[in-house]
Amino acid sequence: MDQSSRYVNLALKEEDLIAGGEHVLCAYIMKPKAGYGYVATAAHFAAESSTGTNVEVCTTDDFTRGVDALVYEVDEARELTKIAYPVALFHRNITDGKAMIASFLTLTMGNNQGMGDVEYAKMHDFYVPEAYRALFDGPSVNISALWKVLGRPEVDGGLVVGTIIKPKLGLRPKPFAEACHAFWLGGDFIKNDEPQGNQPFAPLRDTIALVADAMRRAQDETGEAKLFSANITADDPFEIIARGEYVLETFGENASHVALLVDGYVAGAAAITTARRRFPDNFLHYHRAGHGAVTSPQSKRGYTAFVHCKMARLQGASGIHTGTMGFGKMEGESSDRAIAYMLTQDEAQGPFYRQSWGGMKACTPIISGGMNALRMPGFFENLGNANVILTAGGGAFGHIDGPVAGARSLRQAWQAWRDGVPVLDYAREHKELARAFESFPGDADQIYPGWRKALGVEDTRSALPA
């Protein structure tokens, strides 16, 4: 059934829809299956996303038609479809009238992902008007709270040097806590890796008690505040709360030094909202493990990493992993800095829409995945700032002189970039950074050719056979 007469209105202008403030706008890259027309398929897509079905039904009235989602722009050559969703379509909490990502996704990314006439459709951007945006929680705290704990300025406080304890699984409580202590002697922030939680060989209660003690010892030894991000992910909201309460109680006087990590993609919006509302004074660390199943450029369905991170800010994540923008080991491009800008700025340009956040707190980019001291200056140069949390696992524990030197090398790389000093020049006066070149010679050869001569390091590579 061709529904284009009802669900398509190409006379609508985007600027008028934005000025009206009554529609959520979504941009999809969509391709119909062979034999289906583009506009007719886009209309069916909008119908399935809102008030329609595959046949006319007798219960439809004028009010129903007034809240139809409407296709307002198509560009078949670019496979672009833009749809306007009336804000009234998205349901709200009965307890407080707040909006929810669950409803947003059910409409914009629900049944339309399994339609028989659509070969693929992926959301690349969305726009929320002020009245709807204000119904979301947004972050309660962000990196400014961590800078305050660290004794830094709460604006432009710079890089938080962090790591992930490796191996990601297999450490029992005592060696895990000792690894934390070792890194904290040189670094700021440690996070649970996303699978770490309450394994039989590493009960959460035992591990957290030892980590809290390791933090106290490291702070006493260095005279510096330290930070820990504890994984409280669970299926059951009551389990999330129980874990969070135990963690904060155990850290005691250092409870403000604790972030609470939730695997937001796999555990879902309910887990993020539970943590955001139950623990508003603590940094909510949104890990996105599993997101690549839908956000990867190789996937033509679902939504992009940009969309995922934008939703995280609405939900109230204090920080979310954003990848390394092509400077680490994970998928990414230098242009992914647009994700960081959308998370941190009060008004930012996305792939299709310019979004105003109306004063909503920023969400902090968290950087991980193959980063080390040698890769960091290029990353900062591409981003334009260093106001991020770095969690470098191999970059710290893979340092030739151990995790303390690894942590210091990461900090020194940031300081070199901050001060505008070439990394090799800075390394001549900072041994931990210099030894990072020997720790990661493959990266050093690629990024800093000639580093051995510059640092006076003997070239021990075997000569190639003639």
UniProtKB/Swiss-Prot annotation:
Cofactors, names only: Mg(2+)
EC number: 4.1.1.39
Binding site for substrate: N111, K168, R288, H321, S368
Cofactor binding summary note: Binds 1 Mg(2+) ion per subunit.
BP terms from Gene Ontology: reductive pentose-phosphate cycle
Positions carrying N6-carboxylysine: K191
InterPro entries linked to this entry: RuBisCO, RuBisCo_large_chain_AS, RuBisCO_lsu_C, RuBisCO_lsu_C_sf, RuBisCO_lsu_fd_N, RuBisCO_lsu_N_sf, RuBisCO_lsuII
GO molecular function, one term: magnesium ion binding
Enzyme class: lyase
Reactions that this protein is recorded to catalyse: 2 (2R)-3-phosphoglycerate + 2 H(+) = D-ribulose 1,5-bisphosphate + CO2 + H2O; D-ribulose 1,5-bisphosphate + O2 = 2-phosphoglycolate + (2R)-3-phosphoglycerate + 2 H(+)
Family: Belongs to the RuBisCO large chain family. Type II subfamily.
Role noted for this protein: RuBisCO catalyzes two reactions: the carboxylation of D-ribulose 1,5-bisphosphate, the primary event in carbon dioxide fixation, as well as the oxidative fragmentation of the pentose substrate. Both reactions occur simultaneously and in competition at the same active site.
NCBIfam families per the UniProt record, alphabetical: PRK13475.1 (NF010002)
Assembly information from the UniProt record: Homodimer.
PANTHER family on file: RIBULOSE BISPHOSPHATE CARBOXYLASE (PTHR42704), RIBULOSE BISPHOSPHATE CARBOXYLASE LARGE CHAIN (PTHR42704:SF17)
More details: The basic functional RuBisCO is composed of a large chain homodimer in a 'head-to-tail' conformation. In contrast to form I RuBisCO, the form II RuBisCO are composed solely of large subunits.
Protein name: Ribulose bisphosphate carboxylase
Native organism: Rhodospirillum rubrum
